Amino acid sequence: MKEVIMKYVVQNAAKYGKASEKAVMGKVMAENPELRKKAKEVLELVKECITEFEALSEEVRKELIKKYSMDSEAKRELETKKLPELEGAEKGKVVMRFAPNPNGPPTLGSARGIIVNGEYAKMYEGKYIIRFDDTDPRTKRPMIEAYEWYLEDIEWLGYKPDEVIYASRRIPIYYDYARKLIEMGKAYTCFCSQEEFKKFRDSGEECPHRNISVEDTLEVWERMLEGDYEEGEVVLRIKTDMRHKDPAIRDWVAFRIIKESHPLVGDKYVVYPTLDFESAIEDHLLGITHIIRGKDLIDSERRQRYIYEYFGWIYPITKHWGRVKIFEFGKLSTSSIKKDIERGKYEGWDDPRLPTLRAFRRRGFEPEAIKSFFLSLGVGENDVSVSLKNLYAENRKIIDRKANRYFFIWGPVKIEIVNLPEKKEVELPLNPHTGEKRRLKGERTIYVTKDDFERLKGQVVRLKDFCNVLLDEKAEFMGFELEGVKKGKNIIHWLPESEAIKGKVIGEREAEGLVERNAVRDVGKVVQFERFAFCKVESADEELVAVYTHP
């Protein structure tokens, strides 16, 4: 019991400087509701623990704060966010796959597939395969850099694939299965134009090429592979049911001619499989046991089941989930982002205004936060609309405990404190969770934000942990004590001229001004600019540059 109470005493004291009996009692009772009957006894223990903690040396208090760090609490919370069990899953026998098209870097939307499939592989001690579905060198043309970007971001999110497959390097395998289907009479070469075949498809009639002999079909197929035909002249179709209630399932295209150099395999091939064909073959060959994908791909399963039926294969257990719409990003496609980068609207794929994982990494998001965010959404079939504020909340739980605090004065206004009796070294919290401190010089020439100056000019304000002044360009010193200033109401942050350096924040929220010199030691880390936002310090050369993380 005492151990539990001391944990909350330490956490509360670390956060607020002094432990509150009421706050600690609330935490203890929430964790152990059965103790409500013994509230008086528990309160006495709380008082005792607070007294004991306050009597400890600063060094011992720091050690206790580390011991009871709320990072472990955040990890426990993440562990409780479990996915529902997979139908028909057995430990050690589950094989999951994440199959992106590498036509750009992974986005926040990609993270959902990476995380959910990766978590199920971990949950069942199974196998996790990353397969690049990169067999469209034109419409969804792969970016050569994106292959590596995907692998980097997958590792950053905490997953190590057991196998990495590049579909474009396995095209002869798909040719072999296409030939088998032709020989079985289940696929045919079709010379109809798109418009002509649409008429047959919509009316449910067979096109004239459907019943050409296997021998003639094989001859056309070989000529396709040799490059004898032009793009759009002929395709290979899978025979399904031309009377199927869904026209999209009727004799779908399995291979088409694309005379375009591929970033990975060059000009080696001119006939490429469609995603539905390639994916169907690979899922079988790789032994995929479960597929989790968007409900917009239900037709893909219906098409692919024809191939599985023809070969006598068992289709993987499939679960379709609803779309996730994130309000703040709207409909940003990879192709539109690429155009905007080329036009100079964005500086690159890691521009902090973009929804790419590279951008979120640059902003200082923790992978555990992204993981927690998506696990909380689950894998239901209903569409979900969600705000980035939910992700911010998850990230804040983690970074708030690690981020050092500094002052950033955006739109600085210079102030001279009149009648300041002496320079004073001011001690401020560096990290309230660890009890560490930082120091600033309390001197006559300081800076405050333009916002604060215009809002509070002519009023008595408290310069945080320093002194009280009557705010003006020539600010009258009003004492060092907190008395006379409404608690929290007119407390503003400030910077001494001697410890201010140029700084700016870039990204979703941009600002320029002056930054506390102490912040240069945190390059590469997320900090909290008090009363502004969490930001990741990116560089500190001629000026300090920080990337906006979130409020």
From Swiss-Prot:
One of its GO terms (biological process) is amide biosynthetic process. Its EC number is 6.1.1.17. A motif ('HIGH' region) lies at residues 100-110. It comes from the Archaea. It is an enzyme of class 6 (ligase). It comes from Archaeoglobus fulgidus (strain ATCC 49558 / DSM 4304 / JCM 9628 / NBRC 100126 / VC-16). GO terms for molecular function: ATP binding; glutamate-tRNA ligase activity. This is Glutamate--tRNA ligase. InterPro entries: Gln/Glu-tRNA_Ligase, Glu-tRNA-synth_arc/euk, Glu/Gln-tRNA-synth, Glu/Gln-tRNA-synth_Ib_cat-dom, Glu/Gln-tRNA-synth_Ib_codon-bd, Rbsml_bL25/Gln-tRNA_synth_N, Ribosomal_bL25/Gln-tRNA_synth, Rossmann-like_a/b/a_fold.
